[in-house]
Structure formats: C-alpha cells, structure tokens
Amino acid sequence: HKVYGPTGIGVLYGKEEWLDKLPPYQGGGEMIEHVSFEKTTFERPPLKFEAGTPDYVATHGLAIALDYVSALGMDNIFAHEQALTHYALQQLREIEGIHIYGHAANRGDAVISFNVDNIHPMDIGTLLDQLGIAVRTGHHCAQPLIETLGTLGTVRASFGLYNTKE
C-alpha cells in the first residue's frame, strides 16, 4: 500500500456514485460550494474531500515516487519482493521453534509475521536491529488478532525494492 513517496499523503479511489454519497470528514477551503446558517453544500469529488491548503510538496513527491515505480515496473518490483519473501521464508523455517503466522504460498504479499518459542518479539527485534535488519515488533495495530493468536505480539518483516538478501 506504500509507493515510496512522502508520508501524510494518499489517494482516495472509488466509484463516483459512492464518492458522491460519502460525506467529507473535514471541512474548509475549496470543498464548500455554498454555506449558510441552514445548510452547507459541498463541491463534487474530488474537491469535496480536499479541505484546506493542499500539501503541494507532498503531492509533488508522490508524483515523483509514482514515476519512479512506474519506470522500474510494478512487475519487476513484485518479482523482487516475492524472491526476497521466498528466500526469507526458507531461512526462517530452518529456525527451531519458529511460528510463522498466516503466510500462504503464492499469496502475493511481501510481509512475514513470526515468533520464536521462549523469545519475546521485542528481544528478537532488538537483536535483528543490532545486525542491521529492520523489523517491526508488537501488535501492529491489530490487538484483537494478536490476542486471538495467544501471543504478546509478533515480529513483522516486510520487503521492498530497497531490500537485498544480504
């Protein structure tokens, strides 16, 4: 869901008929067609969802990021991420006591969540960080899932075009 652009910017993509029905979540700027004490009428999408001054710097950064990934080719990025994910899964499965959560073959994502018996996920994250390997640890904004798994958290490795096997 990320395309290597700046933080704090995104795209709302949807069918026009649904966007027309969707209320704006903020107010201000050029999104207002007419306002009175009785009623506010909003512009049509996309203006309807653009409150305040747009972040022109982030918009430009997103455009450059999209040009970059387009030039590389999404198929090439996908193939690279899949190769890294496959390699990492092979390596992880060699670890005694490993528990890999929810990763089915050929699912298409480049994310692996795991734990190792008797080692706290944060400890694994700290050790990997000392080796120059960046991972996330914790509940990953999914506490109900983590509770269902019966664990305190997981280690999550995700792969992108900037990662290598090394």
Where are these regions (language model features)?
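Pyridoxal 5′-phosphate
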Residues: 1-166
